Amino acid sequence: MLCLHNKICRNKLHQNILAETEPRTTISFYKYFDIQNPNLFRDRFYLQMNELKIFGRIYIAKEGINAQISVLNSRINAFRTMLYTSHPQLDQLRLNFALDNNRQSFWMLRMKVKKLLVADGIQEPNFNCFNANNYLKAEEVNILLENPNILFIDMRNNYEYEVGHFQHAMEIPSRTFREKLPIAIKMLQHNKERKIVMYCTGGIRCEKASAWMLHNGFQHIFQVEGGIIGYVNRAVKLGLPLKFIGKNFVFDDRLGERITSDVIAYCHQCKNSCDDHTNCLNQDCHNLFIQCRQCTKKYDGCCSLSCQQTLRTRITRLKNNFIK
């Protein structure tokens, strides 16, 4: 019988990855294109990825694919061949290679069929998410950043912008992409004739945002090719100065990639300079926040005294039950 889902417990998965001796590379990619049967595509793609022992998180929808994966270095070429032949729309698809491969990003393969690749809250039936194609390479980005008449818009969540962003980029204050789209339209409504450059981590959010801006009458919309990851990789390759400062937040176990030595954020508890995200160890909370090492020790990895007390109470209860 075909295996179409992970059936190994989390502890065993961690043991397996720790036992690996071959390094892995984190890769991300996306593509907006029409998938007639997402469930069939998902099952076939899962079998192909699982055979190559690829880990990661992959979303499939009628509007395309969005993937962040971890690949054994010896199987990167085999993965490319498989990907480029799995669907005509994926042939020669751009791959974003992670900026930091010193830490493990994924421990298992998860692949889900979703209604949308990115939850956008858009209700207009005539909206075309495929209508965005003005991509800027790193060298073009650096030139445009020097022009005060051009607006750079960060389409990531506020906690991502907090730890790193392009110099002089405008933040659209919100915690989700769904919230961000109407706010962006309102904030920029008097700039429909100006050149606007949008960016995000790897490109998928700013591509949909670019199409939405064009749909709403904005005339000159551009996006950074490959997002922050694509920009940094190309800038480093060409020896260009990096105009992105700080850390690039990522949605995997690493929670961030160091781009420059600048630390532009602060610990949410003591306000000292820090840009390390973590999740509150109180599982009833699990809040994502920035915490320095001193506060990690002081609060037992929790975001508040209340969560710390809840965690300690739970640990005490577990110890007492174990003794019994």
UniProtKB/Swiss-Prot annotation:
Keywords, alphabetical: Oxidoreductase, tRNA processing
Broadest EC class assigned to this enzyme: oxidoreductase
Catalytic activity of the protein: uridine(34) in tRNA + AH2 + O2 = 5-hydroxyuridine(34) in tRNA + A + H2O
Domain Rhodanese positions: 146-233
GO BP: tRNA modification
EC id: 1.14.-.-
Stored Pfam families: Rhodanese, Rhodanese_C, UPF0176_N
Active site per UniProt: C200 (cysteine persulfide intermediate)
InterPro entries: Rhodanese-like_dom, Rhodanese-like_dom_sf, Rhodanese_C, TrhO, TRHO_N
Alphabetized SMART domains for the sequence: RHOD
GO MF annotation terms: oxidoreductase activity, acting on paired donors, with incorporation or reduction of molecular oxygen
Family: Belongs to the TrhO family.
Stated role: Catalyzes oxygen-dependent 5-hydroxyuridine (ho5U) modification at position 34 in tRNAs.
UniProt protein name: tRNA uridine(34) hydroxylase
The organism of origin for this protein: Baumannia cicadellinicola subsp. Homalodisca coagulata
Gene, per the UniProt record: trhO
